[in-house]
Design a protein with these regions (language model features):
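N-terminal accessory targeting/assembly segments
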Residues: 1-132
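Glycine-rich, often acidic-flanked micro-motifs
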Residues: 1-55, 196, 204-224, 234-240, ...
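Glycine- and acidic
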Residues: 67-71, 168-176, 216-218
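Catalytic cores of large soluble enzymes that bind and process phosphate-bearing ligands
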Residues: 70-78, 175-183, 327
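Short alpha-helical segments and helix-capping/turn motifs at coil-helix boundaries
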Residues: 79-88, 129-132, 158, 312-325
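Extended, Lys/Arg-enriched charged tracts that mediate electrostatic binding to polyanionic substrates
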Residues: 106-150, 301-311
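Charged, amphipathic alpha-helical linker segments immediately N-terminal to NTP-binding catalytic cores
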Residues: 137-197, 202
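Conserved glycine(s) of the Walker
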Residues: 227-230
Length: 350
């Protein structure tokens, strides 16, 4: 006996679909995973097989490869074959469904969905924190969907791993990666296209508001990975408030739309002394950790890189204790370009 779940571009059958469980239930499921450990802070730390996004295993489904120059592609026929392979696998699995919105502005919130094996409930819990959940209807119709099977190999692809992207139908199928970044990126990649179609510019940027004598000013913060984008976004000088950590839409006229109700933060070298806000959010019971070194007594060593420097944590914005709702942020006043590393040439030199 199977259950059925239908979406705009898929019909799935599974042994069960657990739809929109609570955070408490998701955390409990994550703690049952064999590669999960509880920490002394009351949250969960999962060690994954894959510790970063798999760009070499990412392919766009198209019959016009020239239209996607610079990107690896697969044919529509091959995408359908992969879909059939994944659908057959799901038929024997217990799945979790997480519904929500990318963004929270009534004019620009995009209905989104993650469908993933219950065996990897930490990813479901992490995505649930990042989606905006207010006002999700019972008949939720996602514009973007990620169907995620971390335990299904994709034979013949790099590392037997595949992220198959169907831009036309807002659908991403992920096979054989247990890294949360594929869930996050799967939705945001589709959202980027929606922003462009609406005349905006999607930006990999933080956003914060800073009080001044002339009123609050809105800053966008851009920089390559490792230059301090998250750190700069969450610093509290002058009572500034973070709006968004990772992706925003910049619209004509300077209006900013946010994407996520939380943060997927790097934890390597995280210091309570120098980054107290992020440290506090990471070390509280509702956060999820990924690939962070953990001592035998359940404490965390953010400076230990014996497994990876790409340790991560997901936490909700409310864990910060203070933030600015993107709907209330003004139009953009300043753009900050970070170039902390000596080997990085800034995008704008003068």
């Amino acid at each position: 006996m199977t259950q059925k779940l239908e979406g705009p571009a898929y019909v799935l059958e599974a042994r069960s679909f657990l739809q929109n469980p609570s955070q408490d239930d998701l955390m409990a499921l994550a703690l049952k995973m064999p590669n999960a450990k509880p920490t002394k802070y009351g949250n969960v730390n999962v060690t994954t097989r894959v510790d970063s996004r798999s760009s070499k295993s990412t392919f766009i489904a198209t019959d016009d490869p020239a239209a996607h120059e610079g990107h690896a592609t697969i044919s529509r026929e091959e995408f359908s074959r992969i879909a059939g392979l994944q659908d057959d696998f799901i038929r024997d699995q217990d799945m979790v469904v997480i519904d929500g919105f990318i963004g929270n502005d009534p004019e620009f919130k995009v209905p989104a969905r993650l469908i993933i094996e219950q065996a990897n409930a930490n990813i479901a819990g992490m995505q649930d924190l990042l989606y905006f959940k207010e006002g999700v209807p019972a008949d939720h119709q996602p514009a973007v969907t990620v169907i995620y099977t971390p335990n299904l190999p994709a034979a013949g692809y790099p590392n037997d791993r595949l992220i198959a992207v169907d831009l036309d139908n807002g659908l991403t199928r992920v096979l054989n990666s247990d890294y949360f970044g594929e869930s996050k990126k799967g939705g945001l990649r589709m959202w980027n296209r929606i922003v462009v179609d609406r005349g905006g510019l999607p930006m990999h940027a933080g956003c914060k508001t800073v009080p001044t004598e002339e009123g609050d000013k809105t800053f966008l913060i851009v920089g390559l990975s490792g230059t301090g984008k998250t750190t700069t976004t969450f610093t509290r000088q002058n009572d500034s408030k973070p709006v968004q950590d990772d992706f925003i839409a910049l619209m004509p006229g300077g209006k900013v739309h946010g994407t996520e109700n939380g943060c997927f933060a790097k934890t390597f070298a995280l210091s309570k002394e120098y980054e107290p806000t992020i440290y506090g959010a990471v070390t509280q019971p509702k956060s999820y950790l990924e690939n962070v070194f953990q001592t035998e007594d359940g404490d965390l060593d953010f400076f230990n890189e014996s497994f990876t420097q790409n340790g991560r944590a997901v936490f909700g914005m409310e864990a910060l204790g203070w933030f600015q709702d993107a709907r209330e942020a003004g139009t953009v006043d300043y753009l900050l370009i970070l170039n902390r590393n000596n080997n990085i040439i800034p995008a704008v030199a003068r």
